Amino acid sequence: TVRATYRTASSLEKAKHVFSYFTDQVDKEFSKIQWVQADVREVSSLEAAFQNIEKVYHLAALVSFDTSSYSKMRSVNIYGTANVVNLCLAYKVQKLCFVSSIAAISKTLNKPFIDEQDEFNLEENNYGYAITKYGAEMEVWRAAQEGLQVLIYNPGVILGAGFWRENSGALFSMTYKEFPFYTEGVTGFVGVEDVAALLVKGMDSEVTNERFVVVSENKSFKEIVDSIARVFEKKPPKIKVSKLLSALGWRLSWLKSKLTGAANTFSKHTAKAAHNSSYYRAEKVKKTFEFEFEPMEQVLKKVAKRYQKDLEN
């Protein structure tokens, strides 16, 4: 039996749509899963999902770089994770696989790449999302100390189809609309199908109480959007945004959010991250699970084709 939680009816419909990328028998495959409406912040709603469960994948999180979302992120990412691990312990779950983020790992000075040996540095990664993902990891390690078998995954920017207005999905919708601006920051990227495959491999293995950086390739944002633009046969961005312009942009976005009450869509951290270059090494996960990542060019082409198909439908 596979049981999965969803928070709202609309999110369940989005999940169902994702199934359409992989099967023509969406209803049949979707009905194989027991869907339970729950919120990680509400223990009573989660308890129904934990009945007779042996293995747990915890992926639920709030991703935001808007400082006004910090308290909500703490509630979902830290306290929600605490609820999940406490129930894992209470219901004697065999193993927990937790999806964290590369945001919870900081650079070490004079080291060319970031890997599992690097730790979180509050002075460097002092923005809300990173702090809350690190806090969530601490809850998972606490559960490990109490006897729960755990694995922590730190994926880079996850690229996948279906959620075109949110997070990395916006890269595809913006590129399709020929958004003209770009920055040259570098970070780690990975396809969602690789993340899913590694979660299953980890759960089915004897490996426990380890963490893994999950990154296919390190790419600049410019390289990513140029690749997407080629698939779409659209114009790639041509206007390079300087650090000065980004600094002005986040201040204007902040002012607009204060005056109108709208979400701050371009925060100070977003501006900084757009110009940062961080290189990640994922040798540990490749070696442990004898795994080869799908090349980013292939991932981008596949996801972009799915975006086009959704537009047609």
Language model: regions and residue ranges:
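Mid/C-terminal beta-alpha module of Rossmann-like enzyme folds, strongest
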Residues: 198-266, 282, 287, 294-313
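NAD(P)-dependent short-chain dehydrogenase/reductase
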Residues: 144-189
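Conserved Rossmann-fold NAD(P)-dependent oxidoreductase catalytic core, especially the SDR/UDP-sugar
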Residues: 79-128
